[in-house]
Each structure stands twice: as structure tokens, then as C-alpha cells.
From Swiss-Prot:
This is Ectoderm-neural cortex protein 1. The keyword Hydrolase does not apply. Residues 46-114 form the BTB domain. Primarily expressed in the nervous system. It comes from Mus musculus. It comes from the Eukaryota. Binds to RB1. Hypophosphorylated RB1 associates with ENC1 during neuronal differentiation, while hyperphosphorylated RB1 associates with ENC1 in undifferentiating cells. Part of a complex that contains CUL3, RBX1 and ENC1. Interacts indirectly with KEAP1. The gene is Enc1. Ubiquitinated by E3 ubiquitin ligase complex formed by CUL3 and RBX1 and probably targeted for proteasome-independent degradation. Quinone-induced oxidative stress increases its ubiquitination. Actin-binding protein involved in the regulation of neuronal process formation and in differentiation of neural crest cells. Down-regulates transcription factor NF2L2/NRF2 by decreasing the rate of protein synthesis and not via a ubiquitin-mediated proteasomal degradation mechanism. The keyword Cytoplasm applies. Kelch repeats lie at residues 296-340, 341-388, 389-444, 446-492, 494-538, 539-585. InterPro entries: BACK (IPR011705), BTB-kelch_protein (IPR017096), BTB/POZ_dom (IPR000210), ENC1_BACK (IPR047097), ENC1_BTB_POZ_dom (IPR030562), Kelch-typ_b-propeller (IPR015915), Kelch_1 (IPR006652), SKP1/BTB/POZ_sf (IPR011333). Pfam families: BACK (PF07707), BTB (PF00651), Kelch_KLHDC2_KLHL20_DRC7 (PF24681).
């Protein structure tokens, strides 16, 4: 009887215009959770007791397993715990923190504040409440400060909170003067102290502070840490210390004189220092290499795209100051800095002839000289420094020359220049020829991003050169096909900005040079094609470029800690930037 009635109803419904009706009550999940929470509070149908401190919490296994992989594994495994009706956390988790986690499990809500954020993050990670862990990390990111960034660095490292770690790390680098006085600094593990003090981005212009911080860390637990002294000394740019301080304070330090390896490190630094003071050749030792905060920014440009002048960017005064005329004006060249020198390679002159020439500007002595010419005349190429050598990558060349190619074909050829021998050498060619690519070095490798391919298309590839193996690979693709972009490096992150499309011209990304992963960052302040970028200290600077007929007139700065771009100053209208480099500022005496 019931079947026939059902069939009759179905038959009547089928004659209408609506055959299916999906009913969904949006508040249903909330109402179920609310009722489950009420059942928990009344201890109805609960099947497990959680103990923390002196408190006990009755719960439903199914609810806990649904929101925590930790409990899911515990209750579904074949171990003893899966059959137990009680779980005892003892003192491994505070009862008030466990109560907050359980309230979240039964309500999907929790209040995070300054008092509980760290404890909640730790407990959320321990019990695998991933949403809670991530929410607490986001809260702590927004409340990051120079006074707490060291603690956040340790916390995020212990619990794999990647973004919180990166932001804390950047803030530590940017606020070294503050964090070195913090008690947390003295309690950092050895590997983290070494990583911090050796960083190129550590913001200090006085290496005495780095040396004193290293010695303070050693002395804090001398018995256990004395063996790390040689490694800590190698993080200090000892040859950049004032000569008197190096000779009288460092070389005479008892902890150093009593340890053979440490003594040898200081003696080598003294030899480098004397070589610098006597201007006796090129000093390439790490102990004599200024950090990026000890760098000066130089802009190359002119009143047209024909570059004829070099300018100094005064970051403090926010001024762009003319410094020197370029001996041979040119366009579509590439510029790169090694130490205190700016290398200008190739390009096209006023007659549009493609050049092999290499001009070198010594910022210390403020004079130009000519280096050995490249093996291939080229323009539209990229250049970067790697292990104290200059590399030129891709570009176009003329129809005649050492390695002939049509002017319309992008080159595969890559050359290496050694400043100590003044000689050029061919190295392994690119996997695909490119021009107008963004070329940088990071983590002892060269990277070429995008560019114009041999077939005139925008290349959506990242090409990577391994100097040890002398070969190029393609470890990743770009988020979009790119050319006329700019790139600059902070640590293991390569930042790419600008481009020749409506979208890419205002976008910016960062590329991890170790994992080859891309992350979108804040958009630049203005659309830019053919812009130029450098890193200085813990920040990025971008200048120049245009979009359509509109020229970009500002010098902008990006702070990765805040993920924010700001305009620093206005570029004179009469100046069209064509290259941007960062050199060593000085070699202190």
C-alpha cells in the first residue's frame, strides 16, 4: 500500500515543471555543532575523557577525530590508546588552552589575544588543530615588533609557521641594534646565531657590533659554546673593522689568542686589512666583503634612452646626485657591480653599432677604465656577479662577428669575466636563447627569468646555471610569460617585478632559489615596463620604466617585512634610468 502511494505521488510530481528540488539549510552545520556542544556540557553520549592539569573534559571521539588528525590517528589506530576511555595530557598542555581548543572543536570559534596566542599555537600544532595554529600565526604576524621578533623566530621555527618565520627573520635583520640587546639573543641556538650574524642583509654599518654580539653569545655559556668561537668569528667581516680595533681589541682578546683556529682566522683578517690599506690588489675574502647595508646605489641614465651619466642615490637625503659622465654613451647595455666597481657591458652606440666594449667605473677612486672586450658583441642582454666573476647572458648580436647571428635572434651564448685575470671565457650556453630577460645570482647560481625567445615569443621559463656543473637547467616556469621585467635578491628570495602587459606591469612575485616555489607579493605602486631593481639592506628599490606613453617618475622601496611599497623620491624628468646597481660603499680604514 505504501509503495503504491509513493509511486502515485511520484507520478503526479513528474507532470510538473520542477523535477528536482535540492533542499539545503545553510545554518544546519552550526545548529548541529551547537547541539553537540550542549550534549558535551550535559555529558550525554560522551565516550572519552581528556585530562589536563587538574581538570577533566568529557568529549565525543567522533567530534575530536573530525577536527584533529592527532585524535583521528589516536582513536583509529590499533594501539592501546584507541581503546582507552581516558587520555591524560598531564602537564604537557595547560587546561585553559585545551578548553579553548575544545570550545573551537564544538563551536568553530575561539578568541585569540596576546595572552593566549603563543600557547594556542603550540597546542594547536601539538594536537594538529591546523586551523588554530595558522590563525594564531596570522595574529602574531600582525603583532610582530622588534622587541618580540626573536621570540617569534624561535616559536615559528619550532612549529613550521613559514610566513611568521620569514617575517620574524626579516624584522631581526632590520632591527639588529635592538635584538642584540635582548635576552632572547643570548639564548638562540648556535646554528641560528651563525645564520643571523653571517647574513648579507644584516642591517649594521658597524661590524664592531657584530663582533661584540658574537663574543657576548659565546661568553653567555662559555663552557659549552667556546668550541663555536671560530665559526662565530667567521660571521664577522673582521677586515672591515677599524684597524686599531682589529689589532688592539680583537687580536689581543684572550679567548682568541688561546685557541689556534680562532687566532688563524684573525691573522688572516689582519693580512686582508693591510692589503686593503695598501691598495694592494683585489681582496675577495668574505671577511672583507661589506654587507648590503654597506652598499651604495648607482643609477645610470640620460636625457634619452642613450645613457651618458652615472648618478649616486643618496638614500638618507632622498636625492639623486650626478657623479660622472660615461666615456662612451650607449643604450641597451647591461650594468653590474662587483665590489666597488660598476661594469658596463655591450650595448649600442650612437651609430647603432653593437659593442663588445666593457667600461669599468671605480666608485672608490671615481675614475673610469676599460676592461677586456667581450667575445661576442651584444645588446639586450643581462649580467650578474657570481663568485667574484661577471657573467653576461643572452641578448642580441650583429650579423657579423665572432659568433654570427641575425640581429633578430636571441642569443644562447653566456660569457664569464674574471677581474683578476681580465679575461673572458665562454661557459655552457642557455637552454633557450633569450634577450630582455631578468638575470640575477642567488645561492651560488645564476637565474634568467623569462625574456624574448628565438621565436620572438615571451618565454615563460626560469633558466638556472650551476657553476660547479657548468650547465643550465629549467627548474621552474614563470607565473606568466615575461619580458622587460626587473629582478633583485634578498637572501634566498628573488623578487621579480614589472613587465610588458597590463597585468604584469604592476605585479610582483618572489621566487625561492632553493625550493623553486613562487609567491605573489604586494603590487608595485605604478605600472612599469623595463624598470630596474636592486636590493640594499633588507629592502628592495625599483626605478624607471614606462607603460604606454607614461613614464614612471618615482624611486620606490619595498619592505618585505610589511609587504608594502612606498615612493622614496621623484626622479628628475630629464633623467631616463637605464640601469641600477648596488656597490660596496667604502672600505673602512
Amino acid at each position: 500500500m505504501s509503495v503504491s502511494v509513493h509511486e502515485n505521488r511520484k507520478s503526479r510530481a513528474s507532470s510538473g515543471s520542477i523535477n528536482i528540488y535540492l533542499f539545503h539549510k545553510s545554518s544546519y552545520a552550526d545548529s548541529v555543532l551547537t547541539h553537540l556542544n550542549l550534549l558535551r556540557q550535559q555529558r550525554l553520549f560522551t565516550d572519552v575523557l581528556l585530562h589536563a592539569g587538574n581538570r577533566t573534559f568529557p568529549c565525543h571521539r567522533a567530534v575530536l577525530a573530525a577536527c584533529s588528525r592527532y585524535f583521528e590517528a589516536m582513536f583509529s589506530g590499533g594501539l592501546k590508546e584507541s581503546q582507552d576511555s581516558e587520555v591524560n595530557f598531564d602537564n604537557s598542555i595547560h587546561p585553559e588552552v585545551l578548553e579553548l581548543l575544545l570550545d573551537y572543536a564544538y563551536s568553530s570559534r575561539v578568541i585569540i589575544n596576546e595572552e593566549n596566542a603563543e600557547s594556542l599555537l603550540e597546542a594547536g600544532d601539538m594536537l594538529e588543530f591546523q586551523d588554530i595554529r595558522d590563525a594564531c600565526a596570522e595574529f602574531l604576524e600582525k603583532n610582530l615588533h622588534p622587541t618580540n621578533c626573536l621570540g617569534m623566530l624561535l616559536l615559528s621555527d619550532a612549529h613550521q609557521c613559514t610566513k611568521l618565520y620569514e617575517l620574524s627573520w626579516r624584522m631581526c635583520l632590520s632591527n639588529f641594534q635592538t635584538i642584540r640587546k635582548n635576552e632572547d639573543f643570548l639564548q638562540l641556538p648556535q646554528d641560528m646565531v651563525v645564520q643571523l650574524l653571517s647574513s648579507e642583509e644584516l642591517e649594521t654599518e658597524d661590524e664592531r657590533l657584530v663582533y661584540e654580539s658574537a663574543m657576548n653569545w659565546i661568553s653567555y655559556d662559555l663552557k659549552k659554546r667556546y668550541c663555536y668561537l671560530p665559526e662565530l668569528l667567521q660571521t664577522v667581516r673582521l677586515a672591515l673593522l677599524p684597524a686599531i680595533y682589529l689589532m688592539e681589541n680583537v687580536a689581543m682578546e684572550e679567548l682568541i689568542t688561546k685557541q689556534r683556529k680562532s687566532k688563524e682566522i684573525v691573522e688572516e683578517a689582519i693580512r686582508c686589512k693591510l692589503k686593503i690599506l695598501q691598495n694592494d690588489g683585489v681582496v675577495t675574502s668574505l671577511c672583507a666583503r661589506p654587507r648590503k647595508t654597506g652598499h651604495a646605489l648607482f643609477l645610470l641614465g640620460g636625457q634619452t634612452f642613450m645613457c651618458d651619466k652615472l648618478y649616486l642615490v643618496d638614500q638618507k637625503a632622498k636625492e639623486i646626485i650626478p657623479k660622472a659622465d660615461i666615456p662612451s654613451p650607449r643604450k641597451e647595455f647591461s650594468a653590474c657591480a662587483i665590489g666597488c666597481k660598476v661594469y658596463i657591458t655591450g650595448g649600442r652606440g650612437s651609430e647603432n653599432g653593437v659593442s663588445k666594449d666593457v667600461w669599468v667605473y671605480d666608485t672608490l677612486h671615481e675614475e673610469w677604465s676599460k676592461a677586456a672586450p667581450m667575445l661576442v658583441a651584444r645588446f639586450g642582454h643581462g649580467s650578474a656577479e657570481l663568485k667574484h666573476c661577471l657573467y653576461v647572458v643572452g641578448g642580441h648580436t650583429a650579423a657579423t662577428g665572432c659568433l654570427p647571428a641575425s640581429p633578430s635572434v636571441s642569443l644562447k651564448q653566456v660569457e664569464q669575466y674574471d677581474p683578476t685575470t681580465n679575461k673572458w671565457t665562454m661557459v655552457a650556453p642557455l637552454r633557450e636563447g633569450v634577450s630582455n630577460a631578468a638575470v640575477v645570482s642567488a645561492k651560488l647560481k645564476l637565474f634568467a627569468f623569462g625574456g624574448t625567445s628565438v621565436s620572438h615569443d615571451k618565454l615563460p621559463k626560469v633558466q638556472c646555471y650551476d657553476q660547479c656543473e657548468n650547465r643550465w637547467s629549467v627548474p621552474a616556469t614563470c607565473p606568466q610569460p615575461w619580458r622587460y621585467t626587473a629582478a633583485a635578491v634578498l637572501g634566498n628570495q628573488i623578487f621579480i617585478m614589472g613587465g610588458d602587459t597590463e597585468f604584469s606591469a604592476c605585479s610582483a612575485y618572489k621566487f625561492n632559489s632553493e625550493t623553486y616555489q613562487w609567491t605573489k607579493v604586494g603590487d608595485v605602486t605604478a605600472k612599469r615596463m623595463s624598470c630596474h631593481a636592486v636590493a640594499s639592506g633588507n629592502k628592495l628599490y625599483v626605478v624607471g620604466g614606462y607603460f604606454g606613453i607614461q613614464r614612471c617618475k618615482t624611486l620606490d622601496c619595498y619592505d618585505p617585512t610589511l609587504d608594502v611599497w612606498n615612493s622614496i623620491t621623484t626622479v628628475p624628468y630629464s633623467l631616463i634610468p637605464t640601469a641600477f646597481v648596488s656597490t660596496w660603499k667604502h672600505l673602512p680604514s
